[in-house]
From Swiss-Prot:
GO BP terms in the entry: cell tip growth; Rho protein signal transduction; root epidermal cell differentiation
InterPro entries (UniProt xref): Ig_E-set (IPR014756), Rho_GDI (IPR000406), RhoGDI_dom_sf (IPR024792)
Pfam families linked to this entry: Rho_GDI
Record keyword Cytoplasm present: yes
Annotated keywords: Cytoplasm, GTPase activation
Residue segments, region Disordered: 1-66
GO MF annotation, one: Rho GDP-dissociation inhibitor activity
GO cellular component, one term: cytoplasm
Gene of this entry: GDI1
Protein name listed in UniProt: Rho GDP-dissociation inhibitor 1
Length: 240
């Protein structure tokens, strides 16, 4: 559900180490540090830089029904009043005469934004090739934030639009998240979806550069956007 999960989920929690070490001598402290390093390595050793096809497409085995145009959706089960009202509510003010015959939906991700209390929103425009150059953004360790997606849907209803995000640090996969965004009908106005609040990890193991892959897919496992990018976590936010 996030760009990068909290410290405990990723094995980057320094606070417990500090509490355990405060009464120990230097030798015990070094031993515990080495043990923590080994534990972190074991925790992440089974992950690789490239996620497997099974991990990336673990929903691909779902057996889905036939796809319909919007006009066909409206005609189907038209005698069922509850279904008819639900479809009308879902479609809203869609001009069926213009797009009702198009089978495949089109989803365009316009931008991603990182919203953090007391900070201006970090608005990330998506390059056409889906691969931002250099470091795409910087996060402060231990900071709370929400992700916000702005996107357009055209042509037809998109069912089960979802977001996946995989994160690597020094070539080792440290996090993978999925979030169901929902089902959306085509409309002229953009959709905005805000993710639940998350907290960036903190501590010296958490700071540094990361690489990540974000995807937006639907129930048919059709990928509308894949973004491969880099970001980093620092002690402080970059200067405005």
């Amino acid at each position: 559900m996030s760009l990068v999960s909290g410290a405990r989920d990723m094995g980057f929690d320094d606070n417990n180490n500090n509490k355990n070490n405060k009464d120990g001598d230097d030798e015990n402290s070094s031993s515990r540090t080495r043990a923590d390093d080994d534990a972190l390595s074991r925790q992440m050793s089974e992950s690789s830089l490239c996620a497997t096809e099974e991990e990336e497409d673990d929903d691909s085995k779902l057996q889905l029904g036939p796809q319909y145009t919007i006009k066909e959706h409206l005609e189907k089960d038209k005698d069922d009043e509850s279904l008819r009202k639900w479809k009308e509510q879902l479609l809203g003010s869609v001009d069926v005469t213009n797009i009702g015959e198009t089978l495949d939906p089109e989803v365009r991700i316009d931008s991603l934004a990182i919203i953090s209390p007391g900070r201006p929103d970090i608005v990330l425009l998506v390059p056409e090739n889906g691969n931002p150059k250099g470091m795409w953004f910087t996060l402060k360790e231990g900071s709370k934030y929400n992700l916000k997606f702005t996107f357009h849907v055209n042509n037809n209803i998109v069912s089960g639009l979802r977001y996946t995000n995989t994160v690597w640090k020094t070539g080792v996969k440290v996090d993978r998240a999925k979030e169901m965004l929902g089902t959306f009908s085509p409309q002229l106005e953009p959709y905005n979806h805000v993710m639940p609040e998350e907290t960036t990890p903190s501590g010296m193991f958490a700071r540094g550069s990361y690489s990540a892959r974000t995807k937006f897919l639907d129930d048919d496992n059709k990928c509308y956007l894949e973004i491969n990018y880099s970001f980093d976590i620092r002690k402080e936010w970059p200067a405005l």
